[in-house]
């Protein structure tokens, strides 16, 4: 198949219809100036072949292919190529019967394009398959060698060169298909994995569940039959038992009514007798009152008055005693405070004394520094006046100073002599005393050792006392704290109890309805389960909740039922079960509307104003979730009657607005809201817990301190005893003769030390005076020089003395201020001490006065008790006289009491009989009702009741124990009811459908898995064939590559070798030999040699599996004329079965072509002219033949 003609219209530079006809089947060349449209002819062929990479035809979009992008009146580009298909062996698939194939491709501005094959519309894929079947795959166009293609081949990696061989061998398409197949297998595998997962996680569990459901359904049917059988037996027994109860109750009722009538008659008789006796007693009492009544009344009045006076006196006495105890406690407190204040006062005095001592020291130091300053000033003045200063700083002449030194030397010598004499006497006296002391030191040593032992024992006891770390004041502090905490706890308890006593309905009490009852099931009253965030909203929240505030919250309706039936509740309550309760709570949209209407802070949903446990959410929504709370009546009115909201609202004052038109409110109550009181009680309870824990900790501390205090007191007692012993021994030691001798010895030793010190001082004074005398002599000799030096020294001493005097003065003033401040504090303490003293004196006076009052009241109480006792005796005596007169009344009263007791007993009997009558009536009615109900509910009773209780029948109650039957029936009904909740009635049908789907899915899964195995086996077989074909292609291409290269570059050789491990599947590389030298790398060749090598490889690949058409676009651009000539000859020699279209500008190339087409650019449009060159070449051929001959 080869190109016969090309028709271009509106394509790139070919604006008008241009037909290029009579293409040579072998070698065609196209030439022309640059820009004349040579390459556009090749582009048109690529365009028709269906190229997808438009950059290869030098366009960015299909519109670029239209002449001037459709701007010159041409709005479409058409390319039509006629192919010769006379070679049926190489014909495209499906076109074996066509001698010519005309293919047209047209693109219209806007991107629309279409294909036509022999005038019929065709799809892009059909055209691609047509060309692909004859080796013209335009999207991998190895038949198309464009400008730059050679350079691209030179830069190819080994794997890319291998890809070219694969494409030539036809295995590349297989590789693409294999990759696609592997991807498809992977996708299918992931789908299979998904199917396996669905089978494992969804379908299999579903099947298991359905099987279980089927088993449950079968069991349910069996259970239903058994329940029906047991129910018949049990109902029959109930019917028989109801008839028996009815008969028995009717007979018992008649008997009870007869007994009641008899008892009523006996009671009437007793009442008659009681009336007669009461009339007799009344007459007797009337007589007695006339005789004793007035006096007895007078005595009773006097006795009552004395009782009142006695109570008042005792009350006053108790009050005075309490006041006395209070004053005495107050006095103790004052005395304790005064003692503490006195300690502080004493401590402050000691501190002032200590600071004053420091101040005195500073004052003396300041005085000395001031005197030193005056002395330094005087010395400076004297030196400045020409005098020299002595040691005292006074200005004197050198002669006077020398005289003074002589006097001091003489004085020191005299004092030394006196001290020497005194020392000698003291030393002799010391020896004598020491000899006497040795004779009497035995008993003294014993006393001294005993004293030392006691002192050590005292120190040991003191250390042990310190280790205890016990402070006597600590226990008192803890006791005071305990007392305070006890008082506070008592107050808090009273507060809580008083609130609970005033509001008993805050307590919810019930009896556990069953054993092992879980109290957590009952949450409690709503009012006790919430906490108000802001007290100011309490009244509003109470209005919102209303009666629901005292509803009981429980976990389930079953819990509520048990409490109501068996909890023995003392009041009526409404139960809120969390499992059932629901409320139409106000949505966020409504709340937002209300807030936008009157302001965000002016309205809130009631539930947002309380805190509660999250598990109570439903109950709180039921009570507080349907009402809004507004700040005022105006706001509440706006919100309630707004057509978008229309919800119930409550104001902070408790006024209620209902959207139905009702308004509740009015005068506000001054009573504190219960929620506020409840918060107060909760706060008090929290504080009570804290105080109670603190009290326990304090008591624990006191218990610990008690043991420690006992140890401390024991050690302290021992220490005091040892202190007394030590004092006695010390007194004895001090009064002994040995001690006096020791004191004399110490005095002598002191005298000897003083004398030795005096000797040292006199020697030092004498030495200094002699040195000073010598210095003065030197000064006399150097008077002028010494004077300047003395002035300088005097100035330095003056400056130093001045600085020191200033410092000491400043320190003294600071200390004075500190003393003044402490004196003021001390004065304050004195005033407080005086105040406490006055208070204690007043308290003592009050105590004395109260004691007198108590004594007086005690005396008065004794008198009133005596008067009361006398009045009581007199009253008893009078009553005794009256009682003797009333013995007859008592006897009659006893009879009345007896008759009344009889009537009470008879009344109890009547009550019991009435209870029995009601019971029998109820039993009869219940039995009748049961019989009617059973007959109505079970129609079969009427026909089968004759068999009830009969032996050897279904209703044989001896064979079938009714009690056991009832229990068994109840268990089966419970089990059946439980089973019904989870029972799937469609399980049988669903299971069949599910099993059918499961089997179908498993069958499809196995088919897919088998197909996968077959595909993988086929791929493996094709891989082997591909490798074989690839080796054949490589060998053939390698051979042709060497042959073509040798022809293009005589004397040179070339080959393709595997890049790694002699395995061509890893890639192929160039090897070029020039003469006998093989080059390892193409970089060692010249540019022309490299181009020829690349071109040789391309042509060798083309030669392996020749395509019908080859297109070469200026491949000779980088070659010289000789190489170009060789290319033309090589094409004639090697490619005799394919059509070549070559674009070239060199004569050496296109002179070898059979047909030459020349392009020109005329008036902005490309034109083509055809030139046949066979005639030119013929003479050359003939000449060649003649020459050979």
UniProtKB/Swiss-Prot annotation:
This protein's UniProt keywords: ATP-binding, Cell cycle, Cell division, Chromosome, Coiled coil, Cytoplasm, DNA condensation, Mitosis, Nucleotide-binding, Nucleus
Main subcellular location of this protein, as a coarse class: nucleus
Source species of the chain: Gallus gallus (Chicken)
Coiled-coil region: 211-503, 674-1030
Occurrences of domain SMC hinge (ranges): 522-639
GO molecular function terms attached to this record: ATP binding; ATP hydrolysis activity; chromatin binding
Cell location: Nucleus; Cytoplasm; Chromosome
CDD domains (UniProt xref): ABC_SMC2_euk
Protein name listed in UniProt: Structural maintenance of chromosomes protein 2
Record text on subunit structure and interactions: Forms a heterodimer with SMC4. Component of the condensin complex, which contains the SMC2 and SMC4 heterodimer, and probably some non SMC subunits that regulate the complex.
Role noted for this protein: Central component of the condensin complex, a complex required for conversion of interphase chromatin into mitotic-like condense chromosomes. The condensin complex probably introduces positive supercoils into relaxed DNA in the presence of type I topoisomerases and converts nicked DNA into positive knotted forms in the presence of type II topoisomerases.
Binding-site positions, ATP: 32-39
Phylogenetic lineage: Eukaryota, Metazoa, Chordata, Craniata, Vertebrata
Highest taxon above the source species: Eukaryota
Record-level GO BP terms: cell division; mitotic chromosome condensation
Cell cycle is among the record's keywords: yes
Signal sequence, renumbered to the chain: none
Family assignment from sequence similarity: Belongs to the SMC family. SMC2 subfamily.
Domain comment (free text): The flexible SMC hinge domain, which separates the large intramolecular coiled coil regions, allows the heterodimerization with SMC4, forming a V-shaped heterodimer.
A GO cellular component entry from the record: condensin complex
